[in-house]
Amino acid sequence: MRKGSVKEVLAKLKYDPREDERDYYIIIEHRGAYGDVKKIPVELIELGHGYFFVGDAQIPYHRIRRVVKKDGKVIWETRKDRRGESD
């Protein structure tokens, strides 16, 4: 699993030419969705200072639970998810 903030991990996936952002997605906390989580491809997000954007929607970084490669490998997750806790 990669180290650093989720914003740093996403910036690397989006801007590092060695990575293909199409190979990754994020899982966000999204109340009302099935299981209160939503899956978003990294290629659809734009990074901001305290938020990221999906179309016109502005979403705070703290809503991101995991960053996952399409093969299922978790490359970043919140500390509470690493401990096996869930909300």
Curated annotation (Swiss-Prot):
Pfam families in the record: MJ1316
Highest taxon of the lineage: Archaea
Signal peptide: none
Transmembrane segments: none
Family, per entry: Belongs to the UPF0248 family.
Protein name: UPF0248 protein TON_0940
Species name: Thermococcus onnurineus (strain NA1)
